[in-house]
């Protein structure tokens, strides 16, 4: 599964995962990138989802030509999805104390300056 979210400012949040034996494994770490410079993924049969596929359809289909078998439109991330990814990690004893948990920011710069617009 290739997840691409429109990050605005001409960029996307991109990550790829594969499910094996009921557990999701990261193939491509979450990253902020230009739709023209996407991570290379091996193989075929990928399913794409997220607002990035709506915003940058041509660039994503061109980059992954022949690799994506289906794009699911109208899917947005939800906390329950993250919880399902975290559960196996927690069960393996790799959880962290809630007081130490912190958000993972992919983009530090959240707005363009006036002269950059």
Locations of regions flagged by a protein language model:
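Acyltransferase
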Residues: 70-117
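Surface "functional belts" at beta-alpha junctions
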Residues: 1-76, 105, 110-111
């Amino acid at each position: 599964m290739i997840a691409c979210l429109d990050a605005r400012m001409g960029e996307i949040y991109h990550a790829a995962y594969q499910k094996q034996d009921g557990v999701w494994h990261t193939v491509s770490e979450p990253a902020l990138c230009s739709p023209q410079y996407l991570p290379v993924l091996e193989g075929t049969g990928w399913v794409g989802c997220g607002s990035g596929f709506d915003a940058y359809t041509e660039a994503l289909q061109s980059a992954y030509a022949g690799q994506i078998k289906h794009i699911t439109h109208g899917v947005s991330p939800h906390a329950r999805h993250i919880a399902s990814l975290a559960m196996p990690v927690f069960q393996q004893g790799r959880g962290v104390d809630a007081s130490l948990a912190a958000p993972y920011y992919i983009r530090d710069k959240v707005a363009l300056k006036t002269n950059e617009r």
